[in-house]
Structures are given as C-alpha cells and as structure tokens.
Amino acid sequence: MTRRLFGTDGIRGTANTDPMTAEMALKVAMATAAQFRRGSHRHVVVIAKDTRLSGYMLEPALTAGFVSMGMDVVLVGPLPTPAVAMLTRSLRADLGVMVSASHNPFHDNGIKLFGPDGYKLSDEMEAAIEARIAADGAAGGPAADLAGPRDLGRASRLEDAPGRYIEQVKASFPRGLRLDGLKIVVDCANGAAYRVAPKVLWELGAEVVPLAVGPDGFNINRDCGATAPAAMRAAVLEHKAHLGLALDGDADRLILADESGTQIDGDQIMALIGRSWAEDGRLKGGGVVATVMSNLGLELFLRDRGLTLVRTPVGDRYVVEHMREYGFNVGGEQSGHIVLSDFATTGDGLLAALQVLAEIQRTGRPASEVLRVFQPLPQLLRNVRFDPAGGVRPLEAAGVQAAIRAGEARLGGRGRVLIRKSGTEPLIRVMAEGEDEGLVASVVADIVAAVEAATVPRAAGEAATVTQVQPAE
C-alpha cells in the first residue's frame, strides 16, 4: 500500500486547504479510530496541539471524528509533541494525536499520530489508514463503523497535563544535580513549549531568560526558535548567559548556543551525549543512530572511539525505528531532533537540553568547551523550492544527474553529495561536504543550478527560491 497523505512526519499542508481541512481531519480521525478499535473496552485518544490559529479548527474536527466512532478524547491543549507520546503511554490510551506543523510557518499545520506504545505509526499503518479514508462511504470505510447513540465517546480536558510532562522531563535529570548558578536563555518559538520549558529550567534552579513565549496564533516560528536562532544567540550575549536553547514550534528539536553565542547543532549534541553515555557504560547498541544528513566529522569522531554511526533516511521516525530494532538508545538528526530512548519514544528538545546541562554542571566547564566535541567537515546545504503540482521531477532530470556525478567526481573520496526531496515541504535539498570548503561550495552551486534549470517556478515569472540553510564551518 502506498501513502499519499502521509509524509515523513504525518500529514502536513496549508491550513484550510486540502489536505489540511476540517473535513479531512474528521476523516483521518474516523479512519484511525476504525483501524485501532479492538474489543469492547472504552477506547481513549489523547489530543494536543501547538499554538497555530488553525489548531482551533483541527482539534474539534478530530475530536468529533473520534467521538463519533465511540472513542473518548482527552484534550491537553498546547503541549510539546513528546508530551503527547508520554501521556499516551501513561494514560494507557489507544492513540495519541499532535496537531502541529513543527518548524513550519503558522499558515501550515499537520497531524501526527502515535500508537499506544508512544511511538509514531509505521508506514504500513499509515497506508492502512489512508486506504480507509479512500474507501469513505464504501465497505471498509470508517462511516461503516460509526458508534450507536449510546456508544458515542466523550471529550474531557486533562488540566494537569503540563505538570505531568514537566515532572517526566525533570526525572531524566540526575538526582543530586541542580542548575543553580546557570543563566539560561530559552527560545520557545511562540510554540507548544512556551509554558513548560521555562518552568522546567526554573524548577531545577536556573535563572531563566525566556524568549518567544507570547503566542498569538500567527507568530509561531516567526524569526525565532530552532530554525531561526539568531535572537536566541543575541540574547545569550546580551544577558551574559551560560547557554541558550532554541526549540521549534512543537519542541521536538533543539539548537543550542554556547556562552559566546556560537550555534551548536544536533550532531554535536549527539556526539556529547554518545561519548558521555559510553564512558558511563550507559550507551546501548555500540554507537549512535543518525541520518544521511549528519556531518562526516561525527562519524569519524565516533569511529576513533570504537563507536559506530548508523545512518538512516531523513526523518526522526526512521531513526527511532532503527534504534528500536537494533537496541540503540541515542539517536537523532543534525537539525536538532534528539532521541534518547531511555527516557522518551520520540525526539524531545527539552529533555536533550537537560542532558547537556547535566554535563556542564558535572564538569564545571563552560558550554563552549563541553559542546565543541568534534571538528565538523565543511558542509553546505541549500534548498530549491519548486511547484509539485507542475508534474516536474527534478531529481530524475538528466542534467541534475550529470551534475551530481560531476560533483562526486570532483570531491573524490574526500567528501560526499546528497540530494533529496523534502518530506514536509516543496523543496529539493542539495547538500555536499568535504575537506575543501571552496570546492564544496562550488559543487553545491553547480547542482543547485542544474536543479533550478529542471524546476518549474511556483508562480509565473518567479525564479525558484534557493535558501542557504547551513553554511560550511
């Protein structure tokens, strides 16, 4: 079975435009309920959201769909994605739902689904749900399984949900340690963690400088958060803070800044935690699981210490799947999704930050020393925006394939090229890394030019937009 609605991180799109409409949310809820209902017990689903305006549309539509199928709904309001996974498990619920488009702008939204074990659904399960949606009104469609008048579900609010999540995150921090004496900037992206993140740090003893904690439905991720950490970095310098944290809209990813304002990505965080846990005998699987986007320097760093770096396709769900299958407990993405399976079933930016802070407190060293774990190779990532409705397939174009082969030949065995389509946005991502920064930039520029030549612009007369995401270091 193929998936058309679901991407690498659930269903995502522009709010009130197919597929991110109230009607589709209703269908998704009904189809998911039909897929998961088993036996005669009262089925329960947990629903959370971030702070987008469209959450007020999608949350009740999902609620109506589940209730119509006889499932009780527990509403927890704005909370991070990892909180949904945690609450789904702790409440013994059958499902968890997060209404969020993560790091995307406010006009997008999405639906992420979690099973009773707190893990995101498999590709096969998502395909089965899609098949039920496609069968709407026919045998096998969700409408065929509607609950009777006496069997409808109920919806209620769990008022102490934020407190439950706060205590769960704090429990991951070593007993006997506190954050006394540390000044920490935390950028909550005007998103799902705007209440809980500052509280966690404050309750552990830190002096907290909160940023982007005034959501208005429109400002989520706007010039703030993990994908725009400039304000956080500036605040670290302004307030002479010891560390800066930037979360994204649903708080499942983390970017840091040390006391000098230098940005620290997920690769350095994974290297730090992997090394620390290996030294303590806590690291499982003999290494770390990351994606094809992680810097080659991380792989070399781990190899020098007798540890392995296992690479998966892009998407934290694939990282988690490999961790579960092969027994790893540290994994993540360069973009800041950090998965620590001893504590959580999905990426949790706040939880990962506490592991870094524990290392800073244990060693008594500044963040600039603790977090510069390895020397990354020069790496450049650029995005080319295209119109998927135009039917063009840039990755299959002969000119693009020729540019990739030429780039690989120029880098030889001293670097690599990766080009892929984003699973969440209409972007072609072009990445190269190697020892020579100038050569890397030249290779990326040539491939980007080839992709642009093969790309249909989004609007008549508009050039394909290219955004440099991570400059070479």
From Swiss-Prot:
Gene3D superfamilies: Alpha-D-Glucose-1,6-Bisphosphate, subunit A, domain 3, Alpha-D-phosphohexomutase, C-terminal domain
EC code: 5.4.2.10
Group of enzyme by EC: isomerase
Active site: 102
Annotated positions of the Phosphoserine modification: 102
Domain of life: Bacteria
One Pfam family it belongs to: PGM_PMM_III
Keywords of the record: Isomerase, Magnesium, Metal-binding, Phosphoprotein
UniProt PTM: Activated by phosphorylation.
The keyword Magnesium appears for this protein: yes
Gene Ontology molecular function, alphabetical: magnesium ion binding; phosphoglucosamine mutase activity; phosphomannomutase activity
Catalytic activity: alpha-D-glucosamine 1-phosphate = D-glucosamine 6-phosphate
GO BP annotation list: carbohydrate metabolic process; peptidoglycan biosynthetic process; UDP-N-acetylglucosamine biosynthetic process
Reported function: Catalyzes the conversion of glucosamine-6-phosphate to glucosamine-1-phosphate.
The protein, known as: Phosphoglucosamine mutase
Gene source species: Rhodospirillum centenum (strain ATCC 51521 / SW)
